[in-house]
């Protein structure tokens, strides 16, 4: 979650409805057809496949409320989830307690800033930064520092996995007209809500403001409206490659989605697996 999003923000309150889990959502119907457009329909299964190849322990940076980490723990992996938002981690813990008791000992939650990560473990086999989470750190320097922090916590043969939207598919000029995005159930109240969304144009720093409101129909029939606002900073294909190189990674695989599709200009996503390299060794090879 963004550092500039307060714990009382509506986007945090509705998070589990906006980004439902196919495996542990209270209301399974929230996992609707729109999740395919959002990029939520197949990503968890892809993370499971990668984790089965790398083994654990697993680090998830910007873990949110556990949509990715909990299913990984269910499959038997030790998972450390890091998020800057105390409220998001509370929701994670609540979702976790609904699982079998033995799952609790496989999950460690840490409230830390991803740009200044300082964990006891530095031998993670894989680190996931899932579902646009890197973009939600809306500053170039902070995004780069997050990648550097991730590298410091990976084993020598560790893998970093990034899932970010393909910016070539975005409306760079924005979309000033609010539109209903979807109607779902609020996991906290059971009430039906509709999310309305709009976006500003990219600014000179490639930041884009995403904003709108939630209309929730309460028990008496009255509608409660709550506004939300956040920024993200989309990253282009060769920009992320240069950032990864600067952080000490090289791209091992670049795919256009979660089903191993080849990356093209029309791909909805950039799904990246990167491995560590030694700067001095790499410089020696080039010389």
What are these regions (language model features)?
Residues 67:
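Conserved SAM/SAH-binding loop-helix junction
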Residues 144-156:
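A short glycine-rich, Lys/Arg-flanked "PGG" loop and its adjoining helix->strand segment in the class I
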Residues 231-287:
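C-terminal lobe and adjacent flexible extensions of AdoMet/dcAdoMet transferase-like proteins
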Residues 1-64:
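Conserved class I S-adenosyl-L-methionine
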Residues 118-126:
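A short acidic, Gly/Pro-enriched loop at the edge of an enzyme's catalytic core
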Residues 71-116:
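Class I SAM-dependent methyltransferase SAM/SAH-binding core
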Residues 161-241:
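SAM-dependent methyltransferase
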